[in-house]
Amino acid sequence: MGRKNYAFVNPQMLVWARSETPFETLESVEEISPSITAKNLEAWEKGDDYPSITEAKKLASLYKLPFATFYLSEEPARKVKRYTDRRTLKGFYSENISYALWSEIQRIESNRDSIVEFTEDETPVRAIPSIPKDDVIEIATAIRAYLGLDTPLRSKTAYGANPFNYYRHIVERNNIIVAQVSGVDIEEMKGLSIYFDSYPIIAINNKDYDRSKVFSLFHELAHIFRRSSSLCTIDMDEHSDQEETICDRIAAAALMPEEAFKQIANECITRIGAVNSICIDRIAGRFGVSTISALRRMHETKVISRKLFFDLLGVITDEYNANIAYIEAARKGKNVPVFYHVKYLNQNGFLLPRTVLMAHASGKITHGEMCRALGVNSKHIGSLEQAVMFK
């Protein structure tokens, strides 16, 4: 057996570092990373033993910290959570989040730090207007004006196969980061918003359906405009807290302005001669939203009665449950290969790679620094550059 290369870390820093993560117990660390046993970690935290350099680096990676942090003599200031966990307000969730979600939030916040670092000497981005009251229509109108949004759309061809990407690009063009969270159950979260004066963050769960993501995106935009950074499930439950209810209404009004929506809905009902799931799907298609979002908007704008709303909700739910296997199969596709740059942009959005690539092009950073900032192998730079810089 070779000689162990010890990392003579500060045990106090190991304890502090774990306290900054969702790992409440030693065993929970071992569950995620079996090579770091609870027994060994306990000995390291007590100072009875030391990890090897390899083990310490693995632990630093797990905790999302620089390796050098473990050698500090004093604990750094605790990182302030920048959002309100609104999932807990209905009593269904504890305040804890999974390691997968926590890890994704760290990744997205780190990406924003990189964007800010490479743009700090440039002209400040356009300020998001502050509206100091709960006027749903005024805030929705401000969102539409800020984004230059024009709905209803002429047809589904406006957004092609993916309405979420259509709206996402509009939002990102206005320097609002839109990332997607991977590996997190949809029941745990649908959306996250973190307000900053420049480059605020929106994160959407990648496991959701594309049209459902559209509503989540605008729900989180409402939080950004209200400066009410939040972690949300966005289930439009009547028992949601007041802030969630307001943001649901703002999202609906921003995506589906009342007068335009009522006109489209009534025209469709007249053309088809009935209010059914086909009619609702066509209405939803003009705005790139889910049938459930369109149905709720029909009720909110009094196009249909409360009774008809619940009747149709039952029909749509039954149709979905009856066809869920087909829907999931169609969604997953036929094992068609997806290019690396497509996966990368799907997860991280366009702002990060565009900012880093421009920093390299202007001579601010080297090629190696560019690859490290993006977290990609050099061989992927060409395809990323083509996808981002010429879009």
Task: Please report, for each region that a protein language model flagged, where it lies by residue.
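Active-site hotspot residues in diverse enzymes, especially metal/ion-binding acidic/histidine motifs
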Residues: 1-391
